[in-house]
From Swiss-Prot:
Name of the gene: uppP
Enzyme Commission numbers on file: 3.6.1.27
Gene Ontology cellular component annotations, sorted alphabetically: plasma membrane
Catalytic activity entry: di-trans,octa-cis-undecaprenyl diphosphate + H2O = di-trans,octa-cis-undecaprenyl phosphate + phosphate + H(+)
Protein name, per record: Undecaprenyl-diphosphatase
Ranges annotated as spanning the membrane: 7-27, 44-64, 90-110, 116-136, 167-187, 197-217, 229-249, 259-279
Family, similarity comment: Belongs to the UppP family.
Purpose: Catalyzes the dephosphorylation of undecaprenyl diphosphate (UPP). Confers resistance to bacitracin.
């Protein structure tokens, strides 16, 4: 039964990791109705490590763009020295953007999980950023031209600003992609570049978060049995496959549409969650 639940959770992760609607928020919601029959320690680790499947989809889809070494894949189109230089610069921008979340998130990770990993905080963050998306798209973007239309022209300073916005996503329900896209739009980065840079920024952030959770899991004396390994593997594989579709969808979507729809979705979901939380509290 846990393998079926793992498939469902993998689908949820694959869809919500890249759309600006909060994968963590959706997994918290899913846990209320689709609970794995596993220990609390495993479930805590599962919710983070499942992201590895999602992030591997970015590596596969954008391998040529992200790979600075021609010899890694001789069958791939060879890069010019200029293209290799741009790839190294892109990685430097990604690392610069990842630093704020690493510096601030590491010491606060356990405290944030303890105090904000619940329905009500998630609901409020869904609503707040939903409103932010709508206001930015309707009030800010129409009055400001995009100054960055190509990811290779993204300034290092802009990468740092986007990284600072990513810190806000440490609060469950915010959405890592949502926070970075909001920040990117506010500093004049086009929707396409904002989405693409968000994909790349997820690589060090999510690999790092997964490594820390795995380390924490074993450091606390837990062990991973064969069934748990299988559940985790199935969820990651499903998240990988679904993420491939979600990334393609979002890259095509932002070429013709803005993020208003996602803002409305977040607000509706947040309100439904608050009603559910109130109803649950009333029933005791």
């Amino acid at each position: 039964m846990d393998f079926i639940r793992a498939i469902i959770l993998g689908i949820i992760e694959g869809i919500t990791e890249w759309l600006p609607i909060s994968s963590t928020g959706h997994l918290i919601i899913a846990d209320e109705f689709i609970r794995l029959n596993q220990s609390a320690a495993f479930k805590e680790m599962f919710d983070v490590v499942i992201q590895l499947g999602a992030i591997l989809s970015v590596v596969v889809l954008y391998f040529h763009k992200l790979n600075p070494f021609n010899k890694l894949n001789p069958a791939d189109k060879q890069k010019t020295p200029r293209e290799i230089q741009l790839t190294w610069r892109l990685w430097l921008k990604v690392l610069i953007a990842a630093l704020p979340a690493a510096i601030i998130g590491l010491p606060l990770n356990d405290w944030l999980d303890k105090h904000f990993y619940h329905f009500v905080p998630v609901a409020f963050m869904l609503i707040i950023y939903g409103v932010a998306f709508i206001v930015i798209e309707r009030r800010w973007v129409p009055n400001h031209e995009f100054s960055v239309m190509d990811i290779d022209r993204l300034p290092y300073r802009a990468a740092l600003y986007i990284g600072l916005f990513q810190v806000l996503s440490l609060l469950p329900g915010t959405s890592r992609s949502g926070a970075t896209i909001v920040g990117a739009l506010l500093i004049g980065v086009s929707r396409e570049v904002a989405a693409e840079f968000t994909f790349f920024l997820g690589i060090p952030v999510m690999f790092g978060a997964s490594f820390i959770k795995i380390l924490h899991f074993f450091k606390n004396g837990n062990s991973l049995n064969l069934e748990q390994f299988g559940v985790l593997l199935v969820a990651c594989l499903v998240a990988f496959g679904v993420s491939m579709i979600a990334i393609k969808f979002l890259t095509d979507y932002v070429k013709k549409h803005d993020f208003t729809f996602f803002g409305k979705y977040r607000i509706v979901l947040g309100i439904v969650l608050l009603i559910y939380a109130a109803f649950k509290a009333f029933l005791g």
